[in-house]
Amino acid sequence: MGNSLKRTIGISGSTGFIGKNLRSYFDKNNISYVRISRTTFQRKKPLLLSKCFCFVHLIGIGAETSEKNFQEVNVELAKKAVEICKQSKIKKIIYFSGLGVSKDSKSNYFISKFNAEQVMINSGLDYTIFRPSYIIGQDDYLTTNIQKQIKQKKI
């Protein structure tokens, strides 16, 4: 097996804000990756990821809608990420959680992120959990939303 196969990284949530920036970094640094969208991810594609040595799980929501809730997206898809890693023989998973996550949280968002972290911790995989605060950059949700509210004279 060649070195290039061992250096490929799987990414879920690659079209989101963090995912787009991560892909840009990988492209600039000639790092090989396989993108998995939320739709493809739900169909489980272990064969597609079999050449990956690591999986970065970025799929998540920060607000619930009538179509998506925290449990389904943040927790159940974390379980699928672990399952896909095991089926694909990927030993390392990286999970983006959130600053403020704890077992004592009262927020449904933070509770879902805590539960997803527990999925990673109890997976048997080598895991890394990041707990970023607001991530700000070009086209990020927070800055874009604030700019929109300023233009509408809401703030």
Predicted feature residues:
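N-terminal Rossmann NAD(P)H-binding glycine-rich loop of SDR-like oxidoreductase domains
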Residues: 2-29
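Structural motif
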Residues: 8, 53-54, 92
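Conserved beta-strand positions in the Rossmann-like core of class I SAM-dependent methyltransferases
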Residues: 10, 34, 128
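Conserved glycine-rich Rossmann-like NAD(P)H-binding loop of the short-chain dehydrogenase/reductase
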Residues: 31-39
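NAD(P)H-binding glycine-rich loop region in Rossmannoid oxidoreductase-like domains
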Residues: 40-88, 98-104
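Conserved Rossmann-fold NAD(P)-dependent oxidoreductase catalytic core, especially the SDR/UDP-sugar
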Residues: 73-134
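NAD(P)-dependent short-chain dehydrogenase/reductase
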Residues: 133-155
